[in-house]
Amino acid sequence: MLKHFKIFFVIISVSSFAEAQTFGFGCLGFVGGYGGFTYQQYEAAGLNDYIRFSNQLENTVDPVDEFNSAMGYRVGLNLFRATFENGIIVTAKGFYQYLSKKNKGTVGVGVNDDNYSMDLTFKNWSIGFDVGWEFTKVVSWKILDGSINFNNVSLTQTTDLPGETIVNKYKSDSGVFGYSIGTGIIVSVIKDYISIEGLAGYTYLVVDNVYNENGTPFLNPVQIPEQAIWTEGKFVESGGFTAVIQLNVGFPLL
């Protein structure tokens, strides 16, 4: 997967450079890096059904909150960013993103109360493009921002018992397909070299289930056979609203 991902990056870079020469704007374009913060909403239907069931058990002292959002960072490369003479901005890019959310609770076993946590993480490699319009020298409108995402989702359950810690880890299939689409604003700090970018949009993501190292699914009706209705939901049923703020740094190709 990563090999094909890198090959695609090279193809985009070469073709974008050729386009720059064809259209003949003042500079042949910029490459650069960026980093920022991401807020992501999602509907973890199956996971939250499991949590609701667990919170109803008699030994629950402090219930675990349900999962509906995560925060984290993204770092990436603008493989090519150029502004045409008519003000249109075109960018080809790739990035890595890490998001996480950790919810805690307490369960009572005998005379002791034990801390319990669930840590949900989203890691993805993405390739994308955007088209914008520079309507002033300082502010540009990112008309359309799109990316294809290859996601890896994991869940870690941790229970702290007296004298020991029990950890159960589950992972999704590798490279679960998803996509993001949005719009935003770019504010130039130093024209073409440094800018601040804000983006809002929607991210599509569906994860059927996650599995431990033995291949046992997390959403398994054997775990709670007396109430297996929660297994009707996918682990992550859908994505949702996404917001990103990032700092871009560019360097001229020539």
Predicted regions and their residues:
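Outer-envelope beta-barrel architecture signal
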Residues: Q21-V31, F84-A92, W125, K137-L144, ...
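Intrinsically disordered, low-complexity segments enriched in Gly and acidic/Ser/Thr residues
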Residues: I190-N214
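Positively charged n-region of N-terminal signal peptides that target proteins for export
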Residues: M1-K6, Q21
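Sec/Tat signal peptide C-region and signal peptidase I cleavage site
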Residues: S16-A20
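Extracellular/periplasm-exposed beta-strand and loop segments of Gram-negative cell-envelope proteins
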Residues: T38-M71, Q97-N124, I148-G178, L205-V244
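Sec-dependent N-terminal signal peptides
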Residues: H4-S15
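Residues on the lipid-exposed face of transmembrane beta-strands in outer-membrane beta-barrel proteins
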Residues: F37, Y73-A82, G94-Y96, I127-W133, ...
